[in-house]
């Protein structure tokens, strides 16, 4: 178990994971500052998985899934939660051993606990991504997803990126032995204990109310369309009209375009929470996002290729 950090707090567990993966050679980057549904959507994973350039990153990512909100009344369902993401390319042969080492560091002796890798291949339709994967079950509870990326944005991942995604709240609930996420000890210092509920319960209540009851449907449809238009403009797929003139970007800008796509995707997720999209419409919207993501993947790969894939040097 980590001696540096109190892993029986949510804060200490995160610090211990960051320290452990930094010691394995990962660069610890910061959370992406936009609404995403999972740590995979962080550009350090979604885009850096493309092309031959090696990488090793780890980070915490706040994730939003509006339809999962329960007004703060469910002990383990949240519309806003945290993942810890590790991505290494090319995936090292011993990545599973490294992961088991992180569990041991958190106090789980593999000889004393039932740790199982259950096959569960992963797919993200909006990212046009899929991979071979496993859920990791710790004493009967899923705590981690392992994925070996095969495609992102419809492009083949060569070499393969290994991804490890920890469900931080679930892992912490197991370590602390609590049945409600809101009872987790977030920190315990000179000023006393702070619980997860102290920090986030009101946000869950209010954001659930907004997501399900008050998010402006007409505004969100308009947002989706505008973000889609802006992404296409930034990818040189269509012009923008300014003062009755067509304006084109000189060179595709995949990183800003990707941010517009994430905004469109979050607008879509809010519309989904408001039940404003039918089943058939839902598929059409997913395909629209997927088409944009494919454009970003191709433009990003081309931009790195034009630079001579500098990370390979």
Swiss-Prot record:
It is an enzyme of class 6 (ligase). It catalyses: tRNA(Gly) + glycine + ATP = glycyl-tRNA(Gly) + AMP + diphosphate. Keywords: Aminoacyl-tRNA synthetase, ATP-binding, Cytoplasm, Ligase, Nucleotide-binding, Protein biosynthesis. InterPro entries: aa-tRNA-synth_II/BPL/LPL, Gly-tRNA-synth_heterodimer, Gly-tRNA_ligase_asu. Its main location: cytoplasm. One of its GO terms (biological process) is glycyl-tRNA aminoacylation. The keyword ATP-binding applies. The keyword Metal-binding does not apply. One of its GO terms (cellular component) is cytosol. Its EC number is 6.1.1.14. GO terms for molecular function: ATP binding; glycine-tRNA ligase activity. It is found in: Cytoplasm. Tetramer of two alpha and two beta subunits. Belongs to the class-II aminoacyl-tRNA synthetase family. PANTHER family: GLYCINE--TRNA LIGASE, CHLOROPLASTIC_MITOCHONDRIAL 2 (PTHR30075:SF2), GLYCYL-TRNA SYNTHETASE (PTHR30075). This is Glycine--tRNA ligase alpha subunit. It comes from Mannheimia succiniciproducens (strain KCTC 0769BP / MBEL55E). The gene is glyQ.
């Amino acid at each position: 178990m980590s001696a540096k950090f109190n892993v029986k707090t949510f804060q200490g567990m995160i610090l211990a994971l960051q320290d452990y993966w930094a010691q394995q050679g990962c660069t610890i980057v910061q959370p992406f500052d936009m609404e995403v549904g999972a740590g995979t959507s962080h550009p350090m994973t979604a885009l850096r998985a493309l092309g031959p350039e090696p990488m090793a990153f780890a980070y915490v990512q706040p994730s939003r899934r509006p339809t999962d909100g329960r007004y703060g009344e469910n002990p383990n369902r949240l519309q806003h939660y945290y993942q810890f993401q590790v991505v290494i390319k090319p995936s090292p042969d011993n990545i599973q051993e490294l992961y088991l080492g992180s569990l041991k560091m958190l106090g789980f002796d593999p000889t004393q606990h039932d740790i199982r890798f259950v096959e569960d291949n992963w797919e993200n339709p909006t990212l046009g991504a899929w991979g071979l994967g496993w859920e990791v079950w710790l004493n009967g509870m899923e705590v981690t997803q392992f994925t070996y990326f095969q495609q992102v944005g419809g492009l083949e991942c060569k070499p393969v990126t290994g991804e490890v995604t920890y469900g931080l709240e679930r892992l912490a609930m197991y370590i602390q032995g609590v049945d409600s996420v809101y009872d987790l000890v977030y920190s315990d210092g000179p000023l006393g204990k702070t619980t997860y509920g102290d920090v986030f319960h009101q946000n869950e209540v209010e954001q659930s109310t907004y997501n399900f009851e008050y998010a402006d449907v007409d505004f969100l449809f308009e947002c989706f369309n505008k973000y889609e238009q802006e992404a296409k403009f930034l990818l040189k797929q269509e012009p923008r009209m300014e003062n009755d003139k067509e304006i084109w970007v000189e060179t595709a800008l995949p990183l800003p375009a990707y941010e517009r796509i994430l905004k469109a995707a979050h607008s879509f997720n809010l519309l989904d929470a408001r039940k404003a999209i039918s089943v058939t419409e839902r598929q059409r919207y997913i395909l629209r996002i997927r088409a944009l993501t494919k454009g970003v993947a191709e433009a990003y790969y081309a931009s790195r290729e034009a630079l001579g894939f500098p990370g390979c040097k």
